[in-house]
């Protein structure tokens, strides 16, 4: 299955985070790293973003139930 690359507006829509929050979390190694698409364009692997979202859900449920 081919990997899909998400651009920043899609990542913002998927995560609900702002641009600055995404880059701050990346700097703190709390968010998937972007990949270079050439020039100044970057993107994120859809699978990595989906895993990050799943991890947040799991952490929230573990914290609130445990």
Q: Where do the model's predicted regions map?
A:
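Polyanion-binding surface elements
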Residues: 1-27, 48, 54-57
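Residue-level signal for beta-strand positions within conserved beta-sheet cores that form or flank
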Residues: 4, 30, 40
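Intrinsically disordered, low-complexity segments
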Residues: 16-19, 32, 62
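Short Lys/Arg-enriched helix C-cap and helix-to-coil transition segments
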Residues: 35-41
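Short, charged recognition helix plus adjacent turn
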Residues: 60-66
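Short, solvent-exposed alpha-helical "recognition" segments
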Residues: 28-34
């Amino acid at each position: 299955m081919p990997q899909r690359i998400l651009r920043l507006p899609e990542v913002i829509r998927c995560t609900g985070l702002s641009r600055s929050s995404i880059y701050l979390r990346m700097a703190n190694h709390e968010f998937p790293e972007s990949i270079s698409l050439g020039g100044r364009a970057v993107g994120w692997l859809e699978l990595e973003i989906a895993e990050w979202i799943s991890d947040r859900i799991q952490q929230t449920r573990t914290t609130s139930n445990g």
